[in-house]
UniProtKB/Swiss-Prot annotation:
Organism: Takifugu rubripes
Keyword Ion transport attributed: yes
Domain of life assignment: Eukaryota
Designated gene of the protein: mfsd5
Keywords: Cell membrane, Ion transport, Membrane, Transmembrane, Transmembrane helix, Transport
Name under which the protein is recorded: Molybdate-anion transporter
Gene Ontology molecular-function annotations: molybdate ion transmembrane transporter activity
Length: 480
């Protein structure tokens, strides 16, 4: 597996370079946003902090499970740790947007840095309770990362700078491109620290702390300067909640939160397309959480360099994202709905393969590795296709609340899957006995079949629906 992983990462990165060059030739030129100096300065101010936060997040990916095994915890105990993180996401995600409005978006970004740094430092402890607290902080931090940074940017882009809304995807496209590269690089750096330098699986978590500190510094300085220059009334908007004006802000934010939740639920229940798309998202992404838990115990017993394997996964996802750009370009004009069907079908075949490659006593790690790469390739196709359809089907003003409702069954399904693993001894025949892992992959394959049926139902329902189709012009629903 050692040689296979290195060969795979080199091959995938070379493929990424070729696809990126092809995609650039087929993609229309940038809008006027690219040459607007004020916009570029504002974009750079945001990305400096945001990319540091993403980098710190990715550093923790390759060796989390390995760290818990290094501390001699059983797989069932590790499953509970993962469940605590997911449950924390379920509990805090609905309130993260409200807290950003009530306490201030910039303050919540600083709080993210503090909570995530504390989460990383808890990894130094072998105490199970301390690690549970760390996972709870990790779930809170993840929910903040996915909401507060983007919320700050969109608010300042539209309300403070009054830039055109059409320029927003320019920033998030650039962030997504960097995000893939950072993920690949994080796996390589984590592998360097943990295995090449023999610093152990805790080293990547400790390395993330100074990057989170740098992120907080940029938020404190650059973002504060941005707010001071562009929003002279900003001080009034961020009064402590104990003051009179702070209490008004708190009450209005709570009222907006309640109304947003009810509007999002009504939007889901009144539009069958939204319900079906939410079902696809809940099924597909809950399975991904189970994959995140299982890939290490499947591959690690066979001498796989986990950081390099993680980089392979991220490179495969990047290949999928680039293939989506090429497939939906003006030259090929493949519809995002068709790409979504292909992605779900690929994920099904991936888990179908894994049910045979993880037979207890007869593990086939190379086949499992190939199946995982196929799954990550499917993810690269899935996310931009889903973003496009969400942008077309879900009204913009209700999108955040609807997506929050989508995440609830998503995390609950993932928690149930991990709790099912907790209930039986799991293994792949490489040091552990039992067939829990194989059974879980079989369950994931069934869930992918259900997701495929939901996709087919969605496009049968909207066969002649222009909202589900990519038009010649790039509109509001275009993928980021």
């Amino acid at each position: 597996m050692f040689v296979t992983a290195y060969f795979a990462v080199i091959s995938l990165l070379a493929l990424c370079v070729g696809l990126e060059l092809t995609a650039r030739r087929l993609t229309p030129p940038e809008s006027s946003a690219a040459v607007n100096p004020a916009f570029r300065r504002f974009q750079a101010t945001f990305l400096r902090a945001y990319l540091l936060a993403l980098w710190a997040d990715w550093l923790q990916g390759p060796y989390l499970y390995k760290l818990y095994r290094h501390y001699s915890f059983l797989e069932s105990q590790i499953a509970i740790l993962y469940v605590c993180g997911l449950a924390s996401c379920v509990l805090f995600a609905p309130f993260s947007g409200w807290l950003s409005q009530a306490l201030g978006r910039r303050h919540m970004c600083i709080f993210f840095c503090l909570s995530y740094a504390t989460c990383c430092l808890t990894k130094l402890s072998r105490d199970y309770f301390v690690l549970i607290v760390g996972r709870i902080l990790g779930g809170l931090s993840t929910s903040l990362l996915t909401t507060t940074f983007e919320s700050w940017y969109v608010h300042h882009h539209v309300e403070i700078h009054d830039f055109p809304k059409e320029w927003i995807p320019t920033t998030f496209t650039k962030a997504a491109t960097w995000n893939h590269g950072l993920a690949v690089g994080a796996g390589l750096v984590a592998n360097l620290l943990a295995e090449w330098l023999h610093l152990g699986p805790v080293a990547p978590f400790l390395l993330a702390v100074p990057f989170l500190a740098c992120c907080a510094w940029f938020v404190l300085t650059d973002w504060a300067k941005e707010e001071a220059e562009k929003s002279p009334e900003g001080i009034k908007q961020t009064l402590p909640l104990g003051t009179l004006n702070g209490g008004v802000t708190h009450l209005s934010a709570r009222a907006r939160f309640s109304r947003s939740c009810s509007d999002g639920l009504r939007c889901m229940l009144s539009d069958k397309r939204v319900m079906l798309l939410g079902g696809v998202q809940a099924l597909f992404e809950s399975v991904l959480y189970i994959f995140i838990f299982l890939w290490t115990p499947v591959l690690d017993p066979h001498g796989s360099p986990l950081g390099i394997v993680f980089s392979c996964f991220m490179a495969a996802s990047m290949v999928g994202s680039l293939l989506f750009r090429v497939a939906t370009s003006t030259r090929y004009h493949l519809q995002p709905g068709h790409v979504l069907c292909v992605a779900v079908l690929m994920a099904f075949f991936s888990f179908f393969m894994l049910t045979f490659s993880t037979v207890p006593g007869q593990p086939r790690p190379h086949e499992s590795f190939l199946a995982f790469l196929l799954l990550e390739l499917a993810c690269g196709l899935y996310f931009p296709a889903l973003n496009f359809l969400q942008g077309r089907i879900i009204p913009e003003e209700k999108r955040a609340s609807v997506l929050a409702w989508f995440r609830l069954p998503l995390h609950l399904l993932a928690c149930l899957g991990l709790l099912a693993l907790h209930g039986e001894v799991s293994g792949t025949g490489a040091g552990e006995t039992g067939s829990g892992t194989r059974h879980m992959f079989g369950g994931c394959a069934v869930m992918m079949l259900a997701a495929l049926m939901a996709v087919v139902s969605l496009f049968t329902l909207g066969r002649n629906d222009t909202d589900l189709k990519l038009e010649g012009s790039r509109g509001e629903g275009e993928m980021y």
